């Protein structure tokens, strides 16, 4: 059985509830000594506001591809047997499950770590959007994990651009002109010398 055949990824259409037992049964296996799960449910309050329900929308083809990629990364990082990920779309009333992740592994540490990684990455990068519906209004929510991921990616991009500029100047020899670029909290000139320019 290939790694992809050991993943069950479902984006559930409006009106379909998450069947927790189905996904736990899917990941169960004689060689698995642990099954780690995460179940996200709708809570009744947020920052002092009474929540009636959450409503989810998704770009399903891309969400499925993203989840598959996240599962592949988890498999390459931890010793996992099977993974199940299910996410509801449409309204999810208070107390009901909107997302479920189940991971089976030989040992609990791999399953627990992979489960945490999967939910964190789902919230940070999968195109599923949430609207919170309150007694006195509603608002589309942007996950804090998503914002943190965007910031992290921007910082990495800036670091790569800076490094590329420095490497390009070094490669060219830069005709003796002095261009200072910050690099790892040190100031170096374009030739890599630690001389200060005067």
Curated annotation (Swiss-Prot):
Transmembrane regions listed in the UniProt entry: none
CDD domains reported in the protein's UniProt record: MoaE (cd00756)
Main location: cytoplasm
Swiss-Prot/TrEMBL keywords: Cytoplasm, Molybdenum cofactor biosynthesis, Transferase
GO biological process assignments: Mo-molybdopterin cofactor biosynthetic process
Pathway where it operates: Cofactor biosynthesis; molybdopterin biosynthesis
EC number: 2.8.1.12
Signal peptide as annotated in the record: none
Reaction(s) this enzyme catalyzes, per UniProt: 2 [molybdopterin-synthase sulfur-carrier protein]-C-terminal-Gly-aminoethanethioate + cyclic pyranopterin phosphate + H2O = molybdopterin + 2 [molybdopterin-synthase sulfur-carrier protein]-C-terminal Gly-Gly + 2 H(+)
InterPro entries in UniProt: MoaE_sf, MOCS2B_euk, Mopterin_biosynth_MoaE
Binding-site positions, substrate: 107-108, 123, 130-132
Pfam families in alphabetical order: MoaE (PF02391)
Oligomeric form and interacting partners: Heterotetramer; composed of 2 small (MOCS2A) and 2 large (MOCS2B) subunits.
Primary role: Catalytic subunit of the molybdopterin synthase complex, a complex that catalyzes the conversion of precursor Z into molybdopterin. Acts by mediating the incorporation of 2 sulfur atoms from thiocarboxylated MOCS2A into precursor Z to generate a dithiolene group.
Protein name: Molybdopterin synthase catalytic subunit
Source organism (scientific name): Arabidopsis thaliana (Mouse-ear cress)
